[in-house]
Curated annotation (Swiss-Prot):
Function: Fluoride-specific ion channel. Important for reducing fluoride concentration in the cell, thus reducing its toxicity.
Family membership noted in the UniProt record: Belongs to the fluoride channel Fluc/FEX (TC 1.A.43) family.
Residues the record lists as binding Na(+): 74, 77
Membrane spanning stretches: 4-24, 35-55, 67-87, 96-116
Membrane topology: Multi-pass membrane protein
Gene3D superfamilies noted in UniProt: TT1751-like domain (3.30.310.70)
Assigned keywords, A-Z: Cell inner membrane, Cell membrane, Ion channel, Ion transport, Membrane, Metal-binding, Sodium, Transmembrane, Transmembrane helix, Transport
Primary localisation category: membrane
Biological process, per Gene Ontology: cellular detoxification of fluoride
Stated name of the protein: Fluoride-specific ion channel FluC 1
Gene Ontology molecular-function annotations: fluoride channel activity; metal ion binding
């Protein structure tokens, strides 16, 4: 909770500065119409719609969404300023009251349209970013590899034992080394195990069926040329990005990240 509060405070500070900048750039009209407040609120609505759409498409993390969406946009657009501007404008005269009513109406309608426009812009941006990912995401294959203190066979046994103790299913094991031997080829010890929680996996496939290509979870224990043993697993968070999972998959992905991390740490450790 404290980390969320800190992120909101930081974002709010930047938002307040952004708001002041906008209000300096857009002074009120001569008739007292608070155009500066209106512009600040509409800009905030557009940006909030954009970051929300990007977050739904897994373009940025929850922390980024908190600091920009909740914190910064909350600092840019405040209801208190909107209400104060309306009251001050309405109290001047009857004609000013009508202007105030128009201001309230325009603010609500413009804010609604700005949010929709921002969400559309965010969706289009997400499509482009998914189509042309940054170089870092191309280089990052989504694999997490840790050194194991055990043999390949024992590492896989420890994966199976820990997964079962956490209520997961162990679906199958594939001994690639044995397969290579049958084919008359040489391959250092290499073994795959497939495990997972059908409940979490089903939630993810209900969101995007293509993630079934990467489910259940796969863990590969393998020995390198120097005799060291490694355990490699898919990063669930990367899988969420790969398949463009939405907000409905958040809880299941977090559970998968925690579960995979726990199993990996146990299997490779003491």
């Amino acid at each position: 909770m404290l980390d969320i509060i800190i992120l909101v405070v930081i974002g709010g500070a930047f938002g307040a500065m952004t708001r002041e900048f906008i209000m300096l750039m857009v002074p009120p009209l001569t008739d007292g119409f608070p155009l500066d407040i209106l512009v600040a609120n509409v800009v905030a609505c557009f940006l909030l719609g954009t970051v929300t759409a990007l977050y739904a498409r897994k373009i940025h993390s929850r922390d980024v969404h908190t600091i920009i969406g909740t914190g910064m946009m909350g600092g840019v657009s405040t209801f208190s300023s909107f209400a104060y501007g309306s009251v001050v404008l309405a109290s001047a005269s009857m004609s000013a009251f009508l202007i105030a009513a128009a201001y309230v109406t325009v603010s609500v309608v413009a804010g609604y349209v700005a949010v929709l426009a921002g969400m559309k812009f965010g969706e289009k941006s997400a499509d482009i970013l998914h189509r042309y990912p940054p170089m870092a995401s191309i280089i990052d294959s989504g694999l997490v590899t840790v050194e194991s203190r055990h043999s390949v066979a024992e590492t896989i046994e420890r994966v199976a034992a820990k997964a079962k103790s956490m209520g997961m299913n162990v679906f199958t094991r594939v001994d690639h080394g044995a397969g290579a031997k049958e084919a008359g080829l040489g391959l250092p010890p290499t073994e795959l195990i497939i495990f997972g929680n059908p409940q979490n996996g089903t939630v993810l496939m209900q969101d995007k069926r293509t993630i079934g290509l990467d489910l259940p979870i796969r863990a590969l224990a393998w020995e390198d040329g120097s005799g060291k043993v490694w355990l490699t697993v898919n990063d669930p968070a990367w899988l969420a990005q790969r398949h463009s999972l939405g907000l409905s998959s958040d809880v299941a992905i977090k559970a998968m990240v925690t579960g995979t991390g726990t199993v990996t740490k146990y299997a490779a450790g003491d």
